[in-house]
Every structure is written in C-alpha cells, then in structure tokens.
C-alpha cells in the first residue's frame, strides 16, 4: 500500500510540475508577443505625440488611410485574447502576421504623411530666403553686408535644421518662429551703385 501511495503522490507531483512547465512556456510565448507589440506601441505613441504637437502648432495633418482598419484588427485581436488568453489565440492562422503587418504599414504610412505635412508647413509658413552662400553671391561686400551676412549665417544654420528634423516640443516651435522672424528682419544693403560694387 505504501508503494501505491508513493506512486500516486509522485504522479500528482509530476502533473503539478508538468502544469508549471506548460505555464512557464505559455508565459514565455505571451511575453514574446508582448515585446513585439510593445515596439509597435512605442512607435504609434511617438507618432501620436508628434501629431498632437503638430496639430497644436497649426500644422495640417493628412488622414492616414489604414488607421480605422488597423484599429479594428487590434480590437478584434484583443477581444479574442480576452476570451481565450493564450498565445495560440493570437497566433492562430495568419492573425498575428496580419496584425503586425497592418501595424507596420500604419507606422510607415504615418511617418511618411507626417514628414510630408511638415515639409509643406515649413515651406509655407517660415522664412523662405536663400541659403547664405547664394545670398552672399548677390550682395556687394560692404562692411554692413558682411556684418549682416555673418548674423544671417548663424541664424540660418540653426533654422535650416528644422526643415528635415521637425520640432519635438512647444519650445522648439517657439525657437523656430523666433529664428524665422530674426532671419526675415535682417536687412542687406542692396542699393550700392555699380561703380562702388565693382570697387568692392
């Protein structure tokens, strides 16, 4: 009898260990999926923050065509997972690959749209003068122009960085507006007589 009792206890322990091992594997599989989704969540959150900042500062944003479709896929995946919280629920068939492909497409299209929206806004609403080298080529080399050109170069260097790297805060937008105003305010001496221009 003692042997039967020991065997029964051993079987029960083995069953508990098996359940623990299966639970550990399931937890590992779910963690892997969570990490993958967290990367998309970080990207989407960053784009949402920059979109909100753009909107607050008057940048017109284009609609992203895949947004509603992707939201629906995420919602369906969540509902399925809440009914059966296992990694296999998410990975069944092509659900996971379809979901991640939609998220990747959404992130890519949103980045492209925001970049284009920023480029248009920058060109339409900020200083549109010539780069310093081109501006210098049109000026007589008077002391006044040299001083103005030096200031122009300094401001333009800080200003032009925003063309490809949009502001990331309200303070950056304020700085950009100030740079644009300062560049616009710089006046060059352009009415130099031709004889003086040749001499300089």
Roles of regions detected by a PLM:
Residues 1-200:
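Amphipathic alpha-helical assembly segments used for oligomerization, scaffolding, or translocation
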């Amino acid at each position: 009898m003692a042997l039967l009792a020991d065997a029964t206890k051993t079987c029960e322990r083995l069953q508990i260990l098996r359940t623990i091992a299966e639970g550990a594997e399931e937890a590992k599989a779910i963690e892997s999926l969570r990490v993958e989704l967290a990367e998309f969540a970080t990207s989407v959150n960053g784009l949402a923050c920059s979109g909100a900042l753009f909107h607050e500062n008057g940048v017109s944003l284009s609609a992203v065509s895949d947004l509603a479709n992707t939201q629906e896929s995420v919602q369906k995946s969540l509902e399925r997972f809440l009914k059966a919280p296992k990694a296999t629920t998410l990975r069944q068939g092509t659900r996971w690959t379809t979901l991640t492909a939609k998220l990747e497409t959404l992130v890519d299209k949103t980045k492209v749209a925001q970049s284009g929206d920023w480029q248009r806004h920058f060109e339409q609403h900020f200083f549109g003068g010539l780069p310093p080298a081109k501006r210098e080529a049109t000026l007589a080399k008077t002391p006044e122009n040299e001083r103005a050109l030096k200031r122009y170069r300094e401001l333009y260097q800080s200003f032009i960085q925003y063309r490809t790297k949009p502001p990331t805060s309200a303070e950056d937008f304020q700085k950009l507006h100030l740079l644009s105003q300062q560049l616009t305010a710089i006046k060059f001496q352009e009415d130099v007589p031709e004889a003086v221009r040749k001499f300089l």
